[in-house]
Structure formats: structure tokens, C-alpha cells
Amino acid sequence: MNIMMQAVPPHSLQAGDTILIVGHGSREDSGNQEIRDFTAQWRARRPELRIELCFIEFAPPELNAALLDAARTSQRVLVVPLILNAAGHVKMEIPEAVEQARLAYPHTEILLAPHLSACDPILAILKRRLRKAMNALDMPDPTSTGVVVLGRGSSDRGANGEMAKMARWLLEEGDHELVDLAFTGITWPRLEKVVQRQVLLGMRQVVVLPYYLYTGTLMQRIHRQVEHLRSQYPQVRFFCGEHFGFENEIFELMDQRVADLRAGVPDSRLPCDGCSYREIAHDLGHGHSHAHTHEHAPAHDHAHDHAHDHVHHPHEDQPA
């Protein structure tokens, strides 16, 4: 990204706050359209807010241009990632775009919220999806029904760790003896291997719970994979859930991010905003061989526990 070295004069157009949603973007436009639909629904729920949308890649409006426009026309911009896991895009590209906009419009306050993250509201969605799956199965017996939480996978171990936490929480708050984690790419284990293990352990039914906000190429691939597994294991009943971007908890989480930023709640800002590890990443060639777990102290005094061997793949398609 090219950093603007000369500041733009302060804006003189529209005052007030702008909420800028940042979606990942997908090569499959149906996924981008769902994010647009989410934005429209959030505007309808919160008509007092000025809510705008941008994408990191694959769809307009593009993050950098949208952020500069918001900074030009607002007194304050609240940047809220509509993204589940904090991998390279959340830790690198979004904070860099925010820094550019701050340089260009120093008189505009720009605040960056955390991603949605692994949290109780997301767990509530997973539990509800699992109950729906069990109600649809012929034999809703949790002792013979394996569960697979299926995420997109990342080269960032912190993002994968959040997925592992969600799978563990789902296990501890339910009656299922097997709740496993699988990934569609980048890392392991993959869905096919996890299902193979569950069948060998005697599971007669398998519930696949995609950990995705919106549709796209990877959600389409997941449904094809489950169809293949049905053919491979005709004695096993499979249920594949859907993505969960329009659940009420997602709107409530976005509301909370905005409220926390406005109130200045501690830890309401993304830890990677202003993080020095990204400067080191640039020296290493834009971060293609540095790992970063962001294990922050609870009080977050910006004393980061960094392990700089994070591998960031800049174009891992499909939002998570």
C-alpha cells in the first residue's frame, strides 16, 4: 500500500460519525450481496446511524477508497470489521488502511473495532444450529452423532486457536461425545479425515457446522464435499448447516462494537491498530513469513506477546 505523506486539509462537508463496515469480499458475488443485504438490514434497525460498507478485496467499494471518503466527510469514523477471525486481513490490511486515512485526514478521528471473534454470542448461534440439526435427524442421539465445526483455516495460529476454542466450548455445553474441528483449507485436519475418524469411532450420524458468515465459493464447496461423503459413507446420516451472517447475534455484536468505541470502553479497539509488529512485517516483505498470535494482556496496555513467525496469505478467498 502507498502511504500518503502529505496530509489533506480538514474536511468541510458532512459532520458526525460514520460507521464503516469492512467485509472480506468473495469471488462469488452472492456472498458480497449477502453482506450488502446485511448492511441494508442494519441500517433499517439503526436508522440514526450513518452506515457505509466496503470490502477488502474482490468487490467494490474498496477499503482504502471508502475509508478515505468517510474520513473526508465525517468528524469521526468507526471502522467495524464484519469478519469472524483475526488473520492477516484484520491484523495487517485494515490497520494499514486506517493509518493511511489518519495521515490524509489528521483532523478526523478514526477508531478501529475488533473483529467479531470467538465469543458467547457466536457460541449461541452454533448451539442453535446444532439443535436444529438434531431435530432434523432420524435418531437425535448425541452419543452416536459426531459434530464437526468447519472453519476456513488460516496460516495464523491465533485465528485457528479461536476456532479450537469454539469447538471446545460447544463440546462442554452439550451432550455430544465427539465435537471436532476441521478446516476447508490452509491448515489441517480437513473435513474428510475428521469424518473418517468419527465413523471409525462408531458415529452413525455426523453434523457439519460451517463456521462462516456468508455464502461464497467455499460454502458451495462444503456442500459438495458433504454430498461426496454421503456417497462414501452410505450407512451414515449427514446434516450440513448453513452460514450464519443474518442471525440476530451478529447485529447485536456490531451494535456493541459501535457502542464500545463511542464510549471509549477499554479493549474496545483492535489491538493491531498501531501495533509495531506490522512495521517489522514490512521490513520482512509485507509479512509473508511472520507469525503473530496477539495474545494480549487482559488490561491491554499494548504490551503484546508476539511470536513473529506468522505466515499471511493475502488472498485466502471467502470471508470467515
Q: Residue locations for each model-derived region?
A:
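Active-site-proximal alpha-helix that buttresses catalytic centers in soluble enzyme cores
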Residues: 1-320
